Amino acid sequence: MSNFYKLLKEKFPRKEDIVTEMINLEAICQLPKGTEYFISDLHGEYDAVDYLLRTGAGSIRAKLLDCFDWQKIVAVDLDDFCILLYYPKEKLAFDKMNLSASAYKTKLWEMIPLQIQVLKYFSSKYTKSKVRKQLSGKFAYIIEELLAEIDRNPEKKSYFDTIIEKLFELDQVEDLIIVLSQTIQVLIIDHLHVVGDIYDRGTQRKN
């Protein structure tokens, strides 16, 4: 028992630290249950498993239908937006090649607020500290600011827009969109359980 108290004191040196942790853990238990994903027989199925993880086994699309009224968002196609969330690098490269420069920039302007709203919706079941850990170090502060301002308080709309415009000036918008998509992919599945064969004998086994 003395060893137990010694270890406890190392992690929580003050009484206040223990109380804070107890409150935090109790509060976490009251949050909505995160999505758990069980998967097995991964051998030789890298591409299929990669697709399932990127799409959350279909959960991302289902959540998007809950998050938005797509009949009112006439400027954005649901399937097109889903592809951006699943394969951001490839989708951006495709759009950049097939759209004019002005049309491409307009599309990026439309995507970022939607991505931020999706991220805010997906992260609502987690604590702020857990969400913060998933954010890229490069864009962590910016994403937190955008999440805080996405409701577009009229008095702060220019603040939100200025952040995005500066990202365009610094040629960082594409990187931000990629990070947002990858973060959404991570947050859609809270726990991943591999319950069967994990040895991949396929061509992509190193991944």
Predicted regions and their residues:
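Feature recognizes metal-dependent phosphohydrolase scaffolds
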Residues: 1-207
